[in-house]
């Protein structure tokens, strides 16, 4: 409010200063020559530089001044809000509630016919334009920073929205190569190579009128959930954005997980990192490690050896938590398929909106999986139906995190590991329990409660897919009901819903995990702990040494039909049908078997220019086109003896298919999908998307394992197309069986028979084991039996900072990096154990 008298100075004697007030960049030839302090009485961005003959000119500095009265009266602000008796008095304060990001620039480089806003599909370095970045908090004058930078339009679909996301790059070309400021107080990183301004995407009002459910906070909230699960996730905060002084709305200022982010958070140099995102697009480094990981997944996880191999690339905790968090979020703009009430309602069939990073050079890490662009979630539906019941537990997109999840979720050891992570996060105050979820949701929504009023004035009527609305969306009519629905419906119900969904795919057992009482307490004196389970005919086993009471068994896999297996195929016609009828399905060969085509697994044809199936087809049936929509296939395989047969305890059929099939094992129908009828010329009941067809879909045939016999067995497939003139066709089958050595009770495990006394600090880990051999998920609880730490019993006694290079043989064996020898020593001066669990270093340490 009021006015400012502003002066500009330089330390260089006799230097001249030029400045601008319209966002343009001053030069020694362009701009107002500074001759003394001047008055600023309206919203203004001052850009200034100093120059002197014979010397290098300074870079350009910028300082923005905003008057709330000016902002409210800008031409883009809707008078239905600015003059509203409900909102007009709140608007001035709403504009001060958040930090400000002000971007100043040559107007025609961003807007107008040649500007990047108009040409929003342009990408890459060539689309980057020079700007000046300012960040400041109206409530804290010391919390400010500014730096020359580059600007690009960001995103996919959201590039077309009227309120576009923006990427900011800090480079030597413009000023300093990194921005140095404590922008995100809860982040250990204080310098940034680039930042992202997200406009809200589908969680904003600028998509179309169906988006009444917008909250503007879903993305940040879900990053917070991933961090509270113990994983790394980009930090961010909400800001008010101004472009050349024009209020541009409520944005999220955040990190994004490129190579610089990963180096900052996980170590190494940016050049060491591979960054791969949706569509397998390589943002940095190489895709070699990602391809190796995907190849392992697409080959299937069928044995202990396979499970160990995939863990060379995967941190299972990070991966499982990422899948749990994203599935919990019910993100309709991510992976597929997903279901509601048993019906596939997938919005997209291609994979979208994921980011992974791996350090592959100068030392390696495993892949980190990041929550990314997750705002079309938590009741933001592409359909008009808000629900907390979407089921993403069967995602399987090819060459994406979905196929990794799909392969792992069929392996028994991962099933129980995944259940352990669910137990950790969905119970006992974990990240996906109602208390933390609701607290975080309320914190984020309260942060933007007033700023949403300004957003309503700026963007309440504009949308991408339609003409402007006649009445603006408002906080009280649209935003409040939307955020309250999440608070009162989605959050209380979603965790229970996903647990039920995961039970259906064997990722959470029906055996009830032990309840430990009390759970995770701090006490200065010994305490009594009890356990119970609701599962009958079971025993609780627990340990007090931090180990798992269960020892995993080993699993081996028998490939009955693989990618190089032989196959016989025929395209039936009326004469063939009259001769063989249904006998082709049985073990006994049909009478015309010598007329069948002999080949290798992977049967089909491809007439489309896309060529999607060519790499999967080994045996071509071009004669099928325009002749028949059906094909018959026979795979023969051997089980050598009774011992082998009796060792098989599971049976899984995997199918690539376009468009439908029915499978017969030794003449018995065991599985089908999109199957029309058994007629020799039947078409499929529905089509299969090409992207889905190339992904193996699993069908559990364990209940039909008794159909197997010693000697020759036959898997017969009736493959079906949508029509005889379909442009492509594909059938590929794989059949595997596994033999598992049972898991064991750990030698250090104790069976629970009654309350136990704890007199020392430690971790109790407990599982329920049923009499039939089924284990529960793991319940884990830490107990501190110690005095609280305070200034009377805890001292910092030694700091080893900036040590010399490692030189002795012993030192060089441990590490050649001298930073590894830095340490801080704490001393307990009491005679008893003290509890440090509630303490952390908030200042003075950086990594």
Stretches with model-predicted labels:
Residues 1-130, 135-150, 468-481, 485-565, ...:
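Short, compositionally stereotyped local motifs that mark structural "simplifiers"
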Residues 167, 183-184, 249-301, 307-308, ...:
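Surface-exposed loop and adjacent secondary-structure segments within mature catalytic domains
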Residues 554-559, 563, 570-572, 578, ...:
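Activation on beta-sandwich/Ig-like modules and their edge loops
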Residues 103, 110, 114, 119-285:
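Conserved ATP-binding subdomain of kinase catalytic cores across diverse folds
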Residues 38-50, 527, 567, 596, ...:
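Short, well-structured beta-strand segments within conserved domains
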Residues 587-636:
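Surface-exposed, low-complexity/disordered Ser/Thr/Gly/Pro/Asn-rich loops and linkers
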Residues 75-82, 90-126, 131-132, 157, ...:
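Middle-to-C-terminal accessory/interaction subdomains
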Residues 61-62, 86, 676, 684-744, ...:
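An acidic-aromatic loop/edge-strand motif
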């Amino acid at each position: 409010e009021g006015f400012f008298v502003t002066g500009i100075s330089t330390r260089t004697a006799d230097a001249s200063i030029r400045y601008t007030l319209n966002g343009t960049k001053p030069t020694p030839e362009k701009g107002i020559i500074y001759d003394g302090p001047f008055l600023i009485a309206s919203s203004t961005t001052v850009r200034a530089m100093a120059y002197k003959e014979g010397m290098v000119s300074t870079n350009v500095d910028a300082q923005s001044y905003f008057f709330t009265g000016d902002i409210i009266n800008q031409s883009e602000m809707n008078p239905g809000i600015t003059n509203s008796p409900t909102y007009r008095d709140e608007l001035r304060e709403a504009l001060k509630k958040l930090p400000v990001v002000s971007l100043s620039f040559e107007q025609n480089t961003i807007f107008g016919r040649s500007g990047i806003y108009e040409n929003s599909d342009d990408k890459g370095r060539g689309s980057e334009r020079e700007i000046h970045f300012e960040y400041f908090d109206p409530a804290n004058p010391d919390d400010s920073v500014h730096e020359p930078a580059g600007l690009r339009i960001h995103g996919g679909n959201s590039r077309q929205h009227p309120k576009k996301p923006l990427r900011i790059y800090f480079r030597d070309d413009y000023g300093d190569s990194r921005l140095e400021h404590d922008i995100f107080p809860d982040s250990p990183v204080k310098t940034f190579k680039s930042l992202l301004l997200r406009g809200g995407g589908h969680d904003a009002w600028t998509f179309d009128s169906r988006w009444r459910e917008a909250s503007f906070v879903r993305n940040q909230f879900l990053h917070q959930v991933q961090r509270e699960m113990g994983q790394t996730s980009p930090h961010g905060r909400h800001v008010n954005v101004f472009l050349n002084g024009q209020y541009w709305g409520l944005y999220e200022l955040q990190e994004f997980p490129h190579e610089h982010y990963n180096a900052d958070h996980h170590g190494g140099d940016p050049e060491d990192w591979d960054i791969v995102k949706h569509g397998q697009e390589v943002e940095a480094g190489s895709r070699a490690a990602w391809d190796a990981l995907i190849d392992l997944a697409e080959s299937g996880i069928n044995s202990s050896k396979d499970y160990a191999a995939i863990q060379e690339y995967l941190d299972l905790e990070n991966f499982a938590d990422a899948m749990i968090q994203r599935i919990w979020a019910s993100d309709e703009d991510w992976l597929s398929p997903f279901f509601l009430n048993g019906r596939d309602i997938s919005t997209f069939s291609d994979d979208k909106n994921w980011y992974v990073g791996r350090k592959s050079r100068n030392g390696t890490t495993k892949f980190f999986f990041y929550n990314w662009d997750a705002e079309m979630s938590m009741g933001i539906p592409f359909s008009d139906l808000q629900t907390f019941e979407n089921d993403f537990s069967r995602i399987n997109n090819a060459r994406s995190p979905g196929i990794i999840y799909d392969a792992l979720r069929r392996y028994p050891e991962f099933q129980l590991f995944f259940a352990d992570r669910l137990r950790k996060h969905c119970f006992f105050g974990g990240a996906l329990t109602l208390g933390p979820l609701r607290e975080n949701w309320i914190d984020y929504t309260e942060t933007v409660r007033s700023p949403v009023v300004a957003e309503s004035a700026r963007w309440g009527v504009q949308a991408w897919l339609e003409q402007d609305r006649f009445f603006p969306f408002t906080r009280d009519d649209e935003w409040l009901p939307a955020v309250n629905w999440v608070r009162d419906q989605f959050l209380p119900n979603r965790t229970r819903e996903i647990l039920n969904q995961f039970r259906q795919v064997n990722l959470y057992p029906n055996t009830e995990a032990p309840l430990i009482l009390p759970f995770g307490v701090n006490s200065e004196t010994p305490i009594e702990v009890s356990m119970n389970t609701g599962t009958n005919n079971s025993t609780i086993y627990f340990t007090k040494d931090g180990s798992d009471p269960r020892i995993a068994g080993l699993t081996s896999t028998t490939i009955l039909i693989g990618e190089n297996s032989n196959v016989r195929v025929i395209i039936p016609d009326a004469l063939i049908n009259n001769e063989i009828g249904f006998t082709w399905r049985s073990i006994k060969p049909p009478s015309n078997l010598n007329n069948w085509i002999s080949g290798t697994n992977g049967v089909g044809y491809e007439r489309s220019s896309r060529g999607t199936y060519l790499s999967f087809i080994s045996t071509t049936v071009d004669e099928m086109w325009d002749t028949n929509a059906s094909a018959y296939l026979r795979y023969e395989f051997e089980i050598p003896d009774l011992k082998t047969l009796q060792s098989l305890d599971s049976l899984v059929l995997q199918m690539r298919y376009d468009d439908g099939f029915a499978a017969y094992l030794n003449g018995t129908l065991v599985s089908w999908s999109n199957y029309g009828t058994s007629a020799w010329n039947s078409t499929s009941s529905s089509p299969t998307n090409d992207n889905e067809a190339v992904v193996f879909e699993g069908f559990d045939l364990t209940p039909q394992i008794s159909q197997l016999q010693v000697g020759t067995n036959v898997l017969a497939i009736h493959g079906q197309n949508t029509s005889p003139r379909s442009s492509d066709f594909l059938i590929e089958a794989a059949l595997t069986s596994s033999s598992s050595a049972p898991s064991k009770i750990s030698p250090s495990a104790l069976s629970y028979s009654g309350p136990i006394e704890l007199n020392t600090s430690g971790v109790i880990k407990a599982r329920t084991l049923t009499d039939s051999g089924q284990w529960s998920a793991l319940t884990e609880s830490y107990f501190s039996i110690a005095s609280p730490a305070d200034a009377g019993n805890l001292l910092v006694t030694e700091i080893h900072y900036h040590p010399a290079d490692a030189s002795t043989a012993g030192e060089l064996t441990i590490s050649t990096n001298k930073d590894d020898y830095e340490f801080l020593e704490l001393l307990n001066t009491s005679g008893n154990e003290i509890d440090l669990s509630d303490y952390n270093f908030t200042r003075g340490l950086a990594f």
